[in-house]
Amino acid sequence: MINITKPLTPKSISQQKQQQQHPYKNISTTKSNNNPQASGSKSFVQEKYPSQLYESEIKIHNQSLAEYDLDIYDIMVNLIETNKPNLSLYKQQPYLTFTIRLKLIDFLLKMSIRLKILPFVFFKAVKIFDRYCSKRIVLLDQSQLIITTCLWIASKVMGGNNHFVNINNLDKIGHENFRTINDLGYGCGGKYLGPTERFRLPKLHELVKLCGAKCKYDQGMFKQMEVHVLNTLEWSLNDPSIEEFIIDSHEFNVININNNNEYEQTITTNDESANANANDGNEFFKIKEFLSYAALYSHDLIDTNIIELGQVIMDLINETFQLQPFDKHYQTILNCDSDHPIRFDMQRYKHIKKAVIKSVLNASDFMMKVFHSKGPQFIYQQFNLQYKLNYTTNSIIGGFGNSGYSPTTTTTTTTSDNISTTPTSSTGSTTPVSSYIGYANSRSSSVSSTSSVASSSNANTPSSSCSTTSTTPLGMTPHKRQKNYSNYSNYSNYSNSSTSLGLTNNNNNNTTISPVDSTTINSHTKNSSQLNYQYHNGGSNNNNHHHHHKPSLSVSIPPPQMHSHHHSSTVYQMVTPPNSANKNSNKSNSANNNNTTTIATTTTTTTNNNNNSQLPAPHQLSYNNYFNSPNMQPPPPMKYTPGRKQQQQQNQGQNQQQPLQLYQGDNNNNGTNTNSKFNSIAGSRAVSSSSSSAVSIASSISTNNYDKYDDDDDDDNSNDLFSSSRRFMNYSNYSSSTINGSVMSGVINNNSGNGKGNGNGGSGTPISENDSPIYTKTRLCNMIH
């Protein structure tokens, strides 16, 4: 039996020289472990791997494989086709959707960075996971366990130059024969720096910890899942990965890397061009790694041949940097030349290229932070500038670090089908792309399989949903769109903007406004999506509004009725231009009375047709503020029968009768003049469509005044009180009966202060515009839905 406690091999010459130079290395590891001060005083320096030896090894390797290169290539292609995931079977997963898959991939990327996994091990792990998902049903509670186990398997299969000793087995193998991490700073056999990067395999307790306590995984579950995954894949893990076709050996060489002084630079010459070439080679490596990782996020590329994917990545790099075959950094597949090109169908080529571009444009925040170097940032910006998206160059330039950029941006709606694989020139008044680097961390981590519309929201509202469509470009991030509108006198300068953010245009030309809570809007800031509507008169009799006649949207958008800003002075700003909103109150009241008399004679058919067309958006309402709007029509009377109302008010105390008397008193003040106007225009039906729609908006909104009289019904019939369907159905009857005062006549006559109400008098007339009720968000939402 071999005595493993003795040294297996004699010390090499370099070890003897190093021991002579550093005599303190003779100290035993046992003493160093017992004496932490002695171990802390040691200093170990890794030797650089000889570059001459590296070049010689590469030369001999190429000569050995030159005779069998075609056979090896055929075997690799066969393995790729055999171990390719099946997308049709992947789509039959009952629980694992593509959205969940993308979240799992994002989680695995974070874990690989946390564990300092070597490059492209993450790519191999995702491919193993896709193969497993093509053969087994994945439960959601086991999804993290499966994909983490795939990372563990991939790190074992292609872990690279791993010479670290498992510290848990030191007692069995003899700790005196090996230099461990504790006393050397690097693993056994790691005395050389290079030629490739070394790393430590992830331990099970680290995987359990990184998955989180909520998952409740243990080390035994990882071991069982590892065997289960290997049995499912039939232990076939030797299929090549993408780095074997797009990465050269010298790009894996860490000796010449100058990445933030992480490794010492071995270039001793003072030639700056040599340093630049070394840095450029590292940047091209990062670009290929970035494009490969981004392609994993596209479900369209799950079953794509990795050789074809690598060819598309190489072509994208050559197109972006305009590299020619005679250039030093020209990218090819497996050293192929014009005699043996990679050939495949052009339609599939365009499909792969389009999917890769979409994946890059939808890169998450975390990925852009990982690939923060100049190369990936540059190619990301070039993709935004070159390929045809539905935004102009001015919108991109205006979004970069310019708080006062021009607001005349065009439509920023971007769809996934509008990406052309033909690059367009980025000439014109554009900023240098190098100045854009540093703004790439503003991407959303959200991925979905459907096309979305880039909508402007509050700057503090993160978009957490997932999307595989082309999202807002880097220069059009939401926090770059906010403008200061505290000075409302400059409103006319911004009203000509043609931004269509916050709107969703459906196929039937119906336009909806994206709901934004009014409480999230700053008191000194207006979102551009709330200002740049195309207003139109539509034959309205209200001439107090000044409209800007510059159409900017293809769909005619009705003007919102109300909007509020929470100013300390309680001065409310209308959505309409402030020139009309700040008119004298006396003039507006007189105009309102004229509008009220005209609107009251509208027919039932006109009112019902426009009920749902111009409802204000939820973000245009306030929670507890009063409005004195010239566009408001008094609300309809209460829909309860006089007999029920009389019985309810008889059971109530004096505190419930007093508000009703105030309500009656206000109506008595305005009753006479209003009824005389009603009688003068009773036969007139010539009312404009915009006026009738204003009736439907104001009449369909329930008010807080109803709560004052119906508090006893909140327990049993609260749904009836706030029901929008019954209010819409019964408003036509109320509008006709309100003119004659027949609906509320019994209630008013029995509860008025002087008891002089009559059936045709002014006692049943609704309140005037100056006594506008409170608009609540809850009731409006109930009406809309």
Curated annotation (Swiss-Prot):
Start and end residues of each stretch annotated as Disordered: 1-42, 408-433, 447-679, 750-774
Induction, as annotated: Transcript is detected only in the apical cells of hyphae, suggesting that HGC1 is transcribed in the apical cell. Induced during hyphal formation and upon exposure to host serum. Expression is regulated by the cAMP/PKA pathway, EFG1, FLO8, SSN6, RAD52, TUP1, and UME6. Repressed by farnesol and linalool.
GO MF terms held by the record: protein kinase activity
InterPro entries listed in its UniProt record: Cyclin-like_dom, Cyclin-like_sf, Cyclin_N, Cyclins_cyclin-box
Its biological purpose: Hypha-specific G1 cyclin-related protein involved in regulation of morphogenesis and opaque cells filamentous growth, and required for both conventional and pheromone-stimulated biofilm formation. Required to maintain hyphal tip localization of actin and SPA2. Regulates the CDC28 kinase during hyphal growth. The CDC28-HGC1 complex phosphorylates and prevents RGA2 from localizing to hyphal tips, leading to localized CDC42 activation for hyphal extension. The CDC28-HGC1 complex also phosphorylates SEC2 and maintains CDC11 phosphorylation throughout hyphal growth.
PANTHER family in the record: CYCLIN N-TERMINAL DOMAIN-CONTAINING PROTEIN 1
UniProt name for this protein: Hypha-specific G1 cyclin-related protein 1
Record organism: Candida albicans (strain SC5314 / ATCC MYA-2876)
Gene that this sequence comes from: HGC1
